[in-house]
Amino acid sequence: MARFFDSRTTIFSPEGRLYQVEYAMEAASQSGTCVGLLAKNGVLLATERSVDKLMDTSIPVPRISWLNENIACCATGNTADGNVLVNQLRMIAQQYQFNFGEMIPCEQLVTNLCDIKQAYTQYGGKRPFGVSFLYMGWDCRFGFQLYQSDPSGNYSGWKATCIGRKSGAAMEMLQKELFSKGYVSPSVEEAKDVAIKVMGMTLGRDSLTPEKLEIAFVQRYGNTTVFHILEKNEIHRLIERNNNLKRRVGS
């Protein structure tokens, strides 16, 4: 009987569960780690980049995607599903700008996509998208914002969060780093150091290299939103700074 409920997207089990949605969320949790931090002067995303010796490194495959001038996102889970939804996000943002002559608010863009993701949990003959997202952005109403969404279509705003592999341990580390002495909103520079610590824990200290990390953040300069993508030498400097701090603490 359990297999009957497993194979039906739209039917609840006797325990009130939608197994296909839970399987989609599990698929998203097995992908590379992505960390998001809301800073007082920006928002930062750091994610694990898949590296293979046989891959052509001259053709980069970015994990962090720009959606419009104010918003970017990172997806974990099924890559093909993620590409489809990123394209959908860009279309929603462009359509809003065409209709209203201004950039779409961050939360509205997240909500619009989550409506689509939720619909796929109740359509017969379809399956949920196996992708979780972190969004970073800015709008004139709420300033800098960080959102997380999952395959069920649920979303929420965060000060710091993590999705993907070892997200539970990463969340504990974020709690320790940011809230152990009372929460104080970090600067972007401080957020970089926290992100490196978390990624070092999820990847392992010996595996933490600039080739395996992608870090980007958004800030405002005057009336312009500016996206920054860290170069490998900048990431290497952050890793070395984190390693030196560990040595001083351990000595």
Swiss-Prot record:
The transmembrane segments are none
Any single biological process term in GO: proteasome-mediated ubiquitin-dependent protein catabolic process
Whether Nucleus counts among this entry's keywords is yes
Q: What is this protein's tissue specificity according to the annotation?
A: Testis, prominent after meiosis II. After meiosis, predominantly localized to the haploid spermatid nuclei of the 64-cell cysts, remaining during the elongation and condensation of the spermatid nuclei. In mature, motile sperm, expression is seen exclusively in the sperm head.
Among SMART domains, the record links this protein to:
Proteasome_A_N
Sorted alphabetically, which Gene3D superfamilies does this protein's record hold?
Glutamine Phosphoribosylpyrophosphate, subunit 1, domain 1
Please provide one cellular component term from the Gene Ontology annotations of this protein: cytosol
Keyword annotations of the record: Nucleus, Proteasome
Cell compartment(s), UniProt: Nucleus
One of the Pfam families matching this protein, by short name: Proteasome_A_N
Please tell me where this protein is predominantly located: nucleus
The family line of this record is: Belongs to the peptidase T1A family.
Its biological purpose is as follows: The proteasome is a multicatalytic proteinase complex which is characterized by its ability to cleave peptides with Arg, Phe, Tyr, Leu, and Glu adjacent to the leaving group at neutral or slightly basic pH. The proteasome has an ATP-dependent proteolytic activity.
Listed under subunit, the entry gives: The 26S proteasome consists of a 20S proteasome core and two 19S regulatory subunits. The 20S proteasome core is composed of 28 subunits that are arranged in four stacked rings, resulting in a barrel-shaped structure. The two end rings are each formed by seven alpha subunits, and the two central rings are each formed by seven beta subunits. The catalytic chamber with the active sites is on the inside of the barrel.
- State the protein's name: Proteasome subunit alpha type-4-like
User: What organism does the UniProt record list as the source?
Assistant: Drosophila melanogaster (Fruit fly)
Starting at the broadest rank, the lineage of the source organism is: Eukaryota, Metazoa, Ecdysozoa, Arthropoda, Hexapoda
